[in-house]
A protein has these predicted regions:
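Class II aminoacyl-tRNA synthetase-like tRNA-binding/catalytic domains
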Residues: 2-234
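Low-complexity, intrinsically disordered short peptide segments enriched in small/polar/basic residues
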Residues: 13, 241-242
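Conserved small/polar residues in nucleotide/adenosyl-binding loops
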Residues: 235-241
């Protein structure tokens, strides 16, 4: 196992000349004879790594056998790219890593669609292989954006003296705008819990109890026909205040 010293998205000109270790998936591979260029990918970005047959024959011979989505670890030295090879579209576009040692963790079978291009397959096909689709750059950016938004909400609300309270996910069925999703009780035979359409009941309990500023980012569920603006489950931000002034 090669313990990484950096991620695939953080190397730049300040690292030139340094020995570094990376782990990741093979995103692209180009064999130019005595040189093999590979785009190594992890959650943080991509780094182009280079295998030179003349300088490191063993690593080069291993690289010739690699396929897309193989998982590898490498040791190498950061070098500057020629001016005409700089890629300004990625954070690591000014450098390469010349590999002197490689360890193959896992070899991949051919993937059912091109992970570098989500549009290469229909949605149903991608969903069947969701664990592969989640490797795509677009979806990973969506997850990062969602994380940043929820963190910003939490920081903003906390700075304004709101506290975050997590309310129960199983509750008594209460009439609202849609049907409830029901969950049978194992202990109380013939009785059911309901998944909340909103945390309304618990909001009112908290307000009456004196929690005049609370917020919650919670999952809500509505058993109704699925539409683009009416998913059966969605994330809800609620921020009731007992007193405005």
């Amino acid at each position: 196992m090669i313990k990484r010293t950096h991620t695939c998205g953080e190397l730049n000109k300040s690292n030139i000349g340094h020995e570094i270790h990376l782990n990741g998936w093979i995103s692209k591979s180009r064999d130019l004879g005595g040189l093999i260029f590979i785009d190594l990918r992890d959650r943080y970005g991509k780094t182009q790594i280079v295998f030179n047959e003349e300088n490191h024959t063993n690593a080069f011979n291993t690289a010739k056998k690699l396929g897309l989505e193989d998982v590898i670890g490498i040791k190498g030295v950061v070098v500057a790219r020629p001016e005409d090879a700089i890629n300004k579209d990625i954070a690591t576009g000014e450098i390469d890593v010349e590999v002197n040692e490689i360890l193959v963790y896992n070899e991949s079978e051919p993937t059912p669609f091109d992970i570098n291009d989500r549009n290469s397959a229909m949605e149903d096909h991608r969903l069947r292989y969701r664990y592969l689709e989640l490797r795509t750059e677009d979806l990973q950016k969506n997850f990062v954006l969602r994380h940043k938004v929820t963190q910003a909400v939490r920081e903003y609300m906390s700075d304004d003296d709101f506290i975050e309270v997590e309310t129960p996910i199983l509750m008594k069925s209460t009439p609202e705008g849609a049907r409830d999703f029901l969950v049978p009780s194992r202990i109380h035979q013939g009785r059911f819990y309901a998944l909340p359409q909103s945390p309304q009941t618990y909001k009112q309990l908290l307000m009456v109890s004196g929690f005049d500023r609370y917020f919650q980012i919670c999952k809500c569920f509505r058993d109704e026909d699925f539409r683009a603006d009416r998913p059966v489950s969605y994330t809800h931000l609620t921020l009731p205040t007992k007193r405005i002034v």
